[in-house]
Amino acid sequence: MAASLRHMAHFQKALLVARSAPRISTIVRATSTLNDGASKVPDHSMHFKLERLWAVGMLPILPASYFIHGPVMDAVLTVALTLHIHWGIHGVVYDYARPYVIGEAAAKAAHVGVYLITGLLLGALLHFNTNDVGITKAFELVFSL
């Protein structure tokens, strides 16, 4: 019993010394929050809404282009399709061709490639509209087969 009391006194003394000693690890209050990284990323919600509104706005253009032919409808359909395709490809590249996945140089090349494809598509459709029957007349010819 005497040994256990001696051990208890030794334990209490060690506990008091431990409480009065400086801490090895102290709590450091940081001024940052978990949302600091999120504030650096641009907000794409407005782009997403605009893309959806654009897709809904294209719904009446597609059937109307079957019945209305002319350079104005060709230009409207060309711009609408080009923007819609550009935003779709851009979204895929933005989501899947990130620098930490495929590398910095490949990610930049992928983003440049999106604009290159968009420019080529717009140029090809405008060339087709001016030097051939036009995109609306071409749709009518395809559907008449």
Curated annotation (Swiss-Prot):
First-listed, main subcellular location of the protein, grouped into a coarse class: mitochondrion
Mitochondrial matrix topological intervals: 1-45, 96-108
InterPro entries, sorted: CybS, SQR/QFR_C/D
Membrane topology listed for this record: Multi-pass membrane protein
Positions with a binding annotation for heme: H84
Gene knockout outcome: Increased sensitivity to phosphine.
SUBUNIT field: Forms part of complex II containing four subunits: a flavoprotein (FP), an iron-sulfur protein (IP) and a cytochrome b composed of a large and a small subunit.
Task performed by this protein: Membrane-anchoring subunit of succinate dehydrogenase (SDH) that is involved in complex II of the mitochondrial electron transport chain and is responsible for transferring electrons from succinate to ubiquinone (coenzyme Q).
Protein name (Swiss-Prot/TrEMBL): Putative succinate dehydrogenase [ubiquinone] cytochrome b small subunit, mitochondrial
Organism this protein belongs to: Caenorhabditis elegans
